[in-house]
Each structure stands twice: as structure tokens, then as C-alpha cells.
A protein has these predicted regions:
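Short amphipathic helix-loop junctions that connect adjacent transmembrane helices
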Residues: 39-53, 251-271
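Transmembrane alpha-helices of Major Facilitator/SLC transporters
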Residues: 66-68, 271-294
Length: 428
């Protein structure tokens, strides 16, 4: 939600509102592009005769680069400004989607052996992880620059809800159109959409605030080490752990449904698309309705989210039919909506104005860490020890995060900062 008028901010609320709406649309487009893969890849892999572990490798390849590069892009946005980095990330995302579409077409048409097609898909996701990862930390820092401490958690919740909105549309669009037009044409359309967003950012996103820290040297290892700063460390640990839970559930859900309900690949696409859409709807409801109504501190949001993750994973352990599986996944997604807004808002509040880009990069990198570990690990557990094992491990991890949220003093301290009087905001 854009902040009210502040005489210290000459841009006024209307210009900020338009800027935030544009960022919302851009992140929603990238959310569509990312979430559709969780509906498309499991049935595509089975059509190509590729083992589940190779699907996990695609996610992990992208996630490793996302993990290491997000802090760098966040720091670069402090140096060169938010808008150029947002535009660059969107452009690279569009290009990576085009490459993925070509690889999928080559694999399905028989022009490339299945493992070569999977390798090309992994290369495309490498481009996204390394370069497309510039968008999220830069957009998050853009919003943090223009909101007070008291407003920031809610404002960042609205921004991250954009990605969740895309997560609703991605599986739904995939389920509706992939069977009709094919994987490659559908992904080309998504690439065009994201490319149009990059053009819109170049032409329409205002940025009057000069970059801070222009003399700071960008050392990738130093930016990554910023995660160990004692102000940020508890939020980074919580975020990485929660992203592992989320990445595990996203990776496994398609295979879990096909196993439990004895579905063929086409049915798996339809059923998983509906489940993913329902979960994303719960995430959006948490971020756009529940969080503004609660006006809770980051600590409370983190605790509530972790508690929901415990309940959701336990539900999946005993789910006996499609409705029960969807219900468990909805609980997991609702909890993630609360927790993600809590740890991103808390990390932003824990540091000063000149460190917002770096903090945004570090918290964004937790997604990369989660997806670097969880997909391969979850699918290994799935194949080796049974389909409920990933949910059992996630339930234990969520219980640990629940304790961290309520017991760590740094999380409590950052939550107290949100109660101070709003500070003047910088111009757009």
C-alpha cells in the first residue's frame, strides 16, 4: 500500500502509487513465468522419460546462481539505481524463457534426446538465476526507499503478493493452454509479456532519488557475507529454512498427486495446476487481506507462518484424497504468505537506509538457497524413502523455525522498530 502524502516527499502519493502498481504488474508477470514450471515440468519429464531427479537438477542449477547473485544485484542497485537493475533482470528473464521454450520444443519433437533437452532447460534457468535475479532485490529496495518503518512490512507484503498473484495465474494458464497450443508457444507468450514489462519500466517507472554509495566497491563474497551480520542473520536463517519448505512442497506436489491418485501426465498437469492455483490464492489472501487487517509485527507474522507450515505438512502426511491434499497445500501456502512478509519486512527494518539494497539482496538470496537444496533433496527422499518423507522433514524444520521466530532477541528488536513514528521518505 503506498504511503500517505508527506510534505517531505515532493513526488506525492499518486506518483508512488503508479510506480508501485507497475512493479506489481512486473513481478506478477515473472511469477507467472516461474510458477508455470511447477505445473509443466513434472508431466513434461514423464513424457520425455526423464527421472524426477533431473527435474530437481533444473531447479537447483538456477537456484545456486540466484543464491550467489541476488546480494550482488542488491548492492549494485544501491550504486547504480533501482530502475536499471529491474529492467535488466526482466529482460534476462524473458530471454531465459525463450531458451527454455526452444529446449522443450526440441525435446518433445524428438529433435534432441531427452537428456540434452533437459540440459538446455537447465542452461536457460541458469541465465535466469544469474541475471534475471536482478529484478526482485531491486524492486524490493525501490519500495523500501519510499516507505517508513511503520509502513514497510505491509508495503513489501503487497509487492511480494504480486509474485503470488502470478503464481495463481501461471498454473491456471498452463492447465488451460498447454494442452491446446503446446509448451513452447505458451512459454513464448510469457516471454513476450515479461519483455513488455521491461519496456514499461524503462518508460514509466520514476526514479528521482540519486543512487547512494556510488563509491562502494562491489565484492561478491563481501555482499554474500552480509548475511552473517548479526542484525540480519536470524532473518536469513528463518528465510532460508522457510524457502526450503516452500521449495520442497512446490517441487513434490505434482509427483505426489500423480503417485497418490494414479494420474497420467496430462491428468497430473490439470490436477497440479488447480492445486498450485489454490495455494497461490491462499498466499495472496494472506498478503493482501490478512496482513493489512492484522497489522502485526514481523515476529508475529513469522511465528504464525511457521505454525501454519507445521499444520500443513502434518495434513499432507495423512491426506487420503485430492481434497485433503489441496487443503494441506493451501495451509502451507497461506503460512508462507505470512512468513515471507515477516522476514523480508523484519530484515529491512533491521538495517539502515543506505543498506536497503544489500539487505534486499540477501533476503532474496534465501530463495536461491532454498531451491538449491530442497528440490534435489526432496525428490531424493520422495524416490528413496516414500512420497510422504519430504513432508515429514518439512514439518520438523517448520517447528524449529517457529521456535526461532518467538525466541530470538534480534527478531524481537526489529519488530519493535516498526512501532516508531514514520520517518520522512525520499522522492520517487
Amino acid at each position: 500500500m503506498p504511503p500517505p502524502y508527506d510534505p517531505a516527499n515532493p513526488s506525492g502519493p499518486n506518483e508512488r502509487r503508479r510506480a508501485f502498481r507497475l512493479l506489481f504488474l512486473c513481478l506478477m508477470a515473472t511469477g507467472i513465468g516461474n510458477s508455470m514450471l511447477f505445473a509443466i515440468l513434472p508431466p513434461l519429464a514423464r513424457d520425455l522419460g526423464v527421472a524426477e531427479a533431473w527435474v530437481g537438477a533444473i531447479y537447483t542449477t538456477s537456484a545456486l546462481l540466484f543464491l550467489f547473485m541476488s546480494p550482488v544485484w542488491g548492492a549494485l542497485s544501491d550504486r547504480y539505481g533501482r530502475r536499471p537493475l529491474i529492467m535488466f533482470g526482466l529482460s534476462c528473464f524473458a530471454l531465459s524463457t525463450l531458451i527454455f521454450a526452444a529446449a522443450a520444443w526440441a525435446g518433445e519433437s524428438g529433435l534432441a534426446p531427452p537428456l540434452i533437452a533437459i540440459f538446455a532447460m537447465a542452461v536457460s534457468r541458469t541465465l535466469f538465476g544469474g541475471l534475471g535475479s536482478a529484478t526482485n532485490p531491486s524492486a524490493q529496495a525501490y519500495v523500501a526507499d519510499r516507505t517508513s518503518p511503520a509502513e514497510r512490512t505491509e508495503a513489501l507484503a503487497g509487492l511480494t503478493a504480486a509474485f503470488g498473484m502470478g503464481a495463481i495465474l501461471g498454473p491456471a494458464l498452463a492447465a488451460a493452454f498447454v494442452e491446446r497450443i503446446g509448451v513452447a508457444p505458451f512459454m513464448i507468450a510469457i516471454a513476450v509479456l515479461v519483455g513488455a514489462c521491461a519496456v514499461a519500466v524503462r518508460l514509466m517507472l520514476p526514479e528521482k532519488t540519486p543512487p547512494r554509495q556510488q563509491a562502494r566497491p562491489i565484492n561478491p563474497l563481501r555482499q554474500f557475507a552480509f548475511a552473517l551480520d548479526r542484525r540480519l542473520a536470524p532473518f536469513v536463517i528463518f528465510g532460508a529454512g522457510y524457502w526450503m519448505i516452500q521449495a520442497s512442497s512446490l517441487t513434490v506436489i505434482g509427483f505426489f498427486l500423480m503417485n497418490r491418485l494414479a494420474l497420467d501426465p496430462q491428468q497430473g498437469l490439470q490436477f497440479s495446476g488447480v492445486a498450485l492455483m489454490a495455494g497461490a490464492g491462499a498466499l495472496i489472501f494472506a498478503q493482501l487481506v490478512v496482513i493489512p487487517a492484522l497489522k502485526a509485527s514481523p515476529r508475529v507474522l513469522m511465528g504464525l507462518g511457521a505454525g501454519m507450515a507445521v499444520l500443513g505438512n502434518v495434513e499432507m502426511l495423512f491426506a487420503a484424497n485430492y481434497a485433503a491434499i489441496v487443503f494441506g497445500y493451501v495451509m502451507l501456502s497461506f503460512g508462507f504468505g505470512l512468513a515471507r512478509s515477516g522476514f523480508t519486512g523484519g530484515a529491512s527494518l533491521a538495517v539502515g537506509p543506505d543498506e536497503q539494497g544489500r539487505a534486499a539482496g540477501v533476503t532474496t538470496a534465501t530463495a536461491g538457497l532454498g531451491f538449491a537444496i530442497a528440490p534435489v533433496g526432496a525428490l531424493y527422499l520422495f524416490q528413496t524413502f516414500g512420497d510422504i518423507t519430504p513432508y515429514l522433514v518439512s514439518a520438523v524444520l517448520a517447528a524449529g523455525l517457529l521456535a526461532l521466530a518467538f525466541l530470538h532477541p534480534r527478531i524481537r528488536k526489529a519488530s519493535d522498530i516498526a512501532k516508531v513514528t514514520p520517518e520522512p521518505r525520499s522522492p520517487v
